């Protein structure tokens, strides 16, 4: 029974868009009764840049540098989906070597993304030490990216029919050394974090999502797998060469913040397993499909004359997309990243719809925080792992 003297009116406060724990420019309008959350309304759109409309006024080759600005912490995945869509639409074959290189880059990007989720998530809860540890390992991944692509973050490495450049001399050995170094570090994170009583108090049984809710809300990625659903597009769709490698889906059944943390820690270990196998089994051959890079009139040209030598090495600016539609998806670190592409027998896509995992996953936030304490909002929002670049697009 509530005593009338102590009963207070609900208080409406605005968290963000500049609050450090909002992970970007997210704004939450929170209704509080004391310290208990009655209601929460996310306000999106502060980082909207019209990415879908830009795509409809650019060729795919011109659009490639833009896509790394969606999820700017896992840029390889946005590039992968951008080249996979026209490849599937036009039935362009990717050489085996290029496929293996892509898988290695994607998994390195997954580890980098999970590391940069883990550090700020722990800092939100109040643990500062892991925040500095994860930057040490993440820097090594960025060094590998810089050696292979020339860029630390916005790589612009994937191309229609392959990748931009082959792996440089000595890169494979360097990457294997990193894998051997990184696995014990994951154990170190676990020793430091998992059984810490303060950490467990903050995350156990907080923000629980049932299996049915996870499916009904359309959640994907670690959010879905932490609720007891063994669903990973790398196993389901078998894109690139994932079906040739031996690895297992990481999942938990509790559906709380702790389960989501455990899934991501497990995924980092599995990613290392995938990278090690791919590096050892990487075949020789071309790293791109040159046929995909010739101009449409170039198909009629001789293979060795001046015209081919001049234009055959450049990405084709007049690659026309057939008049059909296609939905392509990849398993990004945050969930299912998809693109619905409609071609119109033109160099520009007629429609380019982005299915951003963060946008779908953040919709369940109001349901999760109702009845919780104000401090739990940081924990729950952090465990969802959103990047506003892809939420607002």
Swiss-Prot record:
GO cellular component: chloroplast thylakoid membrane
Transcription recorded as keyword: no
Gene3D superfamilies: Cytochrome-c3 Hydrogenase, chain B
Location (main, coarse): plastid
Catalysed reactions, semicolon-separated: a plastoquinone + NADH + (n+1) H(+)(in) = a plastoquinol + NAD(+) + n H(+)(out); a plastoquinone + NADPH + (n+1) H(+)(in) = a plastoquinol + NADP(+) + n H(+)(out)
GO process terms (BP): photosynthesis, light reaction
A Pfam family recorded for this sequence: Complex1_49kDa
Sorted UniProt keywords: Chloroplast, Membrane, NAD, NADP, Plastid, Plastoquinone, Quinone, Thylakoid, Translocase, Transport
EC number: 7.1.1.-
PANTHER family reported for this sequence: NADH DEHYDROGENASE [UBIQUINONE] IRON-SULFUR PROTEIN 2, MITOCHONDRIAL, NADH-UBIQUINONE OXIDOREDUCTASE 49 KDA SUBUNIT
Function field: NDH shuttles electrons from NAD(P)H:plastoquinone, via FMN and iron-sulfur (Fe-S) centers, to quinones in the photosynthetic chain and possibly in a chloroplast respiratory chain. The immediate electron acceptor for the enzyme in this species is believed to be plastoquinone. Couples the redox reaction to proton translocation, and thus conserves the redox energy in a proton gradient.
Name the record gives this protein: NAD(P)H-quinone oxidoreductase subunit H, chloroplastic
Source species of the chain: Chlorokybus atmophyticus (Soil alga)
């Amino acid at each position: 029974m509530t005593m009338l003297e102590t009963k207070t009116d609900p208080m409406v406060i605005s968290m963000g868009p500049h609050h450090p724990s909002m992970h970007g420019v997210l704004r939450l309008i929170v209704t509080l009764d004391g310290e208990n959350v009655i209601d929460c309304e996310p306000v999106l759109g502060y980082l909207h840049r019209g990415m879908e409309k830009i795509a409809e006024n650019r060729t795919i080759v011109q659009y490639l540098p833009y896509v790394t600005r969606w999820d700017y912490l896992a840029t390889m995945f946005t590039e992968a989906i951008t080249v996979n869509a026209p490849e599937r639409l036009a039935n362009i074959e990717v050489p085996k070597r290029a496929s293996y290189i892509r898988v290695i880059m994607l998994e390195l990007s997954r580890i980098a993304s999970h590391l940069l989720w883990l550090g700020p998530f722990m800092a939100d809860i109040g643990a500062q030490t892991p925040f500095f540890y994860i930057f040490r390992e993440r820097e090594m991944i960025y060094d590998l990216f810089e050696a292979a692509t020339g860029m630390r973050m916005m790589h612009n490495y994937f191309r229609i029919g392959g990748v931009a450049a082959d792996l440089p001399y000595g890169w494979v050995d360097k990457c294997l050394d990193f894998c051997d170094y990184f696995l014990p570090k994951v154990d170190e994170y676990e020793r430091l974090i998992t059984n810490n009583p303060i950490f467990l108090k903050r995350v156990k049984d907080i923000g629980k999502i049932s299996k049915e809710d996870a499916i009904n809300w359309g959640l994907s990625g670690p959010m879905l797998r932490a609720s007891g659903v063994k669903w990973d597009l790398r196993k389901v769709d078998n894109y690139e060469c994932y079906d040739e490698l031996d690895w297992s889906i990481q999942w938990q059944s509790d559906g709380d913040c702790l389960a989501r943390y455990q899934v991501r820690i497990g995924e980092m270990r599995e990613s290392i397993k995938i990278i090690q196998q791919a590096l050892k089994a990487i075949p020789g051959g071309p790293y791109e499909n040159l046929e995909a890079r010739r101009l449409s009139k170039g198909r009629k040209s001789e293979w060795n004359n001046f015209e081919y030598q001049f234009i055959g090495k450049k990405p084709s600016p007049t690659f026309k997309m057939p008049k059909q539609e296609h939905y392509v998806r990849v398993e990004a670190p945050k969930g299912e990243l998809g693109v619905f592409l409609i071609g119109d027998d033109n160099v520009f896509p007629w429609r380019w719809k982005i299915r951003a995992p963060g946008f779908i996953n953040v919709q369940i936030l109001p349901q999760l925080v109702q009845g919780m304490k104000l401090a739990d909002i940081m924990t729950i929002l952090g465990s969802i792992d959103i990047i506003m670049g892809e939420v607002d697009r």
